[in-house]
């Protein structure tokens, strides 16, 4: 039996999230259907991070076990031939059985693209979040950065956890939150050991509330310490959220994600 790691991009706007569901309009269902058509047998996939409906991925990682022997590029080209245009494998890598897409990951990274202009932009519909402000108004990005600083380190993130979250522990380590201001756009990068269900979207809701001056930056620390979801802002829209990277031990040379063909081209190139 051979274990293969696969890298996946997808535009999540048209799908009901990653995880397989009875109606079968999920990324996992489309991917496993395509793999079955390529391999001639149903193969189950294990994913690094399950994404919600409307959430995208530039660096999703999965693994599967198979007796089929093919060159890595044959997996990419062959499976992609049966996938819808909004889902595509980017690479394939043979790994040993010690590799696990979910449990071996020690860091995950999400980006969020937020448009703050006075009107919608149809060309990025479904691919960016919105906080439409009147002409001349801007989010207070410095206040957002000050609020985000309270999130760094190991914390109980229960205040930002969805009620249906199945994680065994709400304690996670946030390594970095980087916020870039670019005209009508605000781009955010979150790096953590792992994320709870809806955690990034709930953090976004709070950061935007601070950016709109509804709360001071220290409010974020109060919400975090309160460990109560009711204290935080409403869950922000999924449209601008992207899973961009998953890190593994050096023994597994998983390719880094390439955001160059997305809204994030060049945005975080100089970020540590």
Swiss-Prot record:
Gene that produces this protein: truA
Entry EC no(s): 5.4.99.12
Protein name: tRNA pseudouridine synthase A
Enzyme class: isomerase
Source organism per UniProt: Cupriavidus taiwanensis (strain DSM 17343 / BCRC 17206 / CCUG 44338 / CIP 107171 / LMG 19424 / R1) (Ralstonia taiwanensis (strain LMG 19424))
Similarity section: Belongs to the tRNA pseudouridine synthase TruA family.
Pfam families: PseudoU_synth_1 (PF01416)
Record's function text: Formation of pseudouridine at positions 38, 39 and 40 in the anticodon stem and loop of transfer RNAs.
Cysteine disulfide partners in this protein: none
MF term (GO), any: RNA binding
Keywords, comma-separated and alphabetical: Isomerase, tRNA processing
Reactions accelerated catalytically: uridine(38/39/40) in tRNA = pseudouridine(38/39/40) in tRNA
Annotated catalytic residues: 52
